[in-house]
Amino acid sequence: MARVQLWVAAACAVVLALAAPSLAGDPDMLQDVCVADLASPVKLNGFPCKANVTADDFFFAGLKNPGNTNNPAGSNVTAANVQSFPGVNTLGVSMARIDYAPGGQNPPHTHPRATEIIFVLEGVLEVGFITTANKLFTKTVTAGEVFVFPRGLVHFQQNRGHGPAAVIAAFNSQLQGTQAIAATLFAAAPPVPSDVLAKAFRVDVPQVDAIKAKFK
């Protein structure tokens, strides 16, 4: 009996070891290239491959210029993911440029499908993430420095300098997904019931409604 249990345990360990890589990020590619056909009506867990591929499919110039930060958050995210850069389809990577006005922030958010690592191009940023145990890890970073945000954890960046700031972000997914906490809760469609949010945040319903109004 003990011998059988040992073999069962060993078999389970092998299965888990083989399955682990597939759980780490996007699925492995099965061909050299598969440039996304964004116009295809076929919707898979990803995008189908387009028939005619050129070198331009693997080129993206969108990160070289600053984005427009004239908005309430004072920041702009320029994405180089599969939706704007079809050549990364099936490759399990993507990038973004984030620009911040003085005092601007990339509000608290999560990426459910990817870890994020940033390289600071210019400026002074306070960055941080919060674990599932509600512990905050925060750091002030400047040009040339790097910080990493673990997959799925709430994180943010705040410009603490007197001038603009910018970073280049990289992700281990072709489409990392972004869920901004405030917009998710206060600008959902259909809306999250105000009494639900009032109880969660321990405030009154009119206060919740006032916050919701700011997102309209």
UniProtKB/Swiss-Prot annotation:
Residue positions the entry lists as glycosylated: 52, 76
Entry-linked InterPro entries: Cupin_1, Germin, Germin_Mn-BS, RmlC-like_jellyroll, RmlC_Cupin_sf
Family under the similarity heading: Belongs to the germin family.
Protein origin, superkingdom: Eukaryota
Which GO molecular function entries does the Swiss-Prot or TrEMBL record give?
A: manganese ion binding
Tagged with keyword Transcription: no
Q: Where in the cell is it found?
A: Secreted, Extracellular space, Apoplast
GO annotation (BP), single: plasmodesmata-mediated intercellular transport
Q: What keywords would UniProt list here?
A: Apoplast, Disulfide bond, Glycoprotein, Manganese, Metal-binding, Secreted, Signal
Q: Describe the subunit structure.
A: Oligomer (believed to be a pentamer but probably hexamer).
Location of the Cupin type-1 domain: 61-209
Write out the function statement from the record: May play a role in plant defense. Probably has no oxalate oxidase activity even if the active site is conserved.
Listed CDD domains? cupin_OxOx (cd02241)
Its recorded name reads Germin-like protein 1-1
Cysteines paired by S-S bonds = 34-49
Protein residues bound to Mn(2+): 109, 111, 116, 155
Primary localisation category: secreted
What is the annotated signal peptide range for this record?
1-24
Choose one Gene Ontology CC annotation of this protein and give it: apoplast
